[in-house]
């Protein structure tokens, strides 16, 4: 998926978290509806296509389905097709799915996740299984499923004439195409998160050149691996460094809703995920809600990048905690 970058200075953020000011929100008592059952169904439907490895029929079919679902909920949708150099320096075709749901704000909030599956199960104990693709129920489909349910809920509010923020949805492709463990050739840099790199550069170009495709964004929220029964979401380093105010807002909302057991106060090492390129290349402050397990050697769940990343590891309570926190956060004025 990506690599954890260990910076010694990350420890300084431990002091910053305890010093954050608590501010009262005008919507302090509001909870916004979210259906974990619906999100779970969206995840299962993605998994039913098979592994969504770029360039495969399963990938293409799932992408078409995602476009139809977003259109069904009233969003404007298009596929951003392009290519990026992969780990071997070859051009890798990609398809980002970009949608816009107009609300009551001029600047939209970015909701994003990756929708592709990793072609290799690098962390499989058995060597012969390492060349099979990861099904990606949690690593990929879970974030997309939560976003689809949030869009569905927002469309209901909009149909009633109620306030919603304008939202841009970007489902990144080729996030999990990073250098495989078995590769022995010369490795190129920035081999993970190809779709977000492509989108971020295009976004910056559209903004700088005043193109009609430019969509002004307030901030972004990335969802990655948000279905694990034992998930904990720390304040990831890059999120806090580039978008600390929005981290504080989301974690404070989670605490108010009773989800502090998931959204913990721990500060995680820097994680190179899609949000890194949204922050550094696009210049949009973006936070990463990602399950992090420092007690494990990989930093992630035991079944990360294995054949066991399937629906058995998707939990309704975790989906509810994440989905309700995110929709309540973005709808708070």
Describe each PLM feature range.
Residues 53-54, 83-87, 104-105, 115-119, ...:
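Solvent-exposed loop/turn segments at secondary-structure junctions
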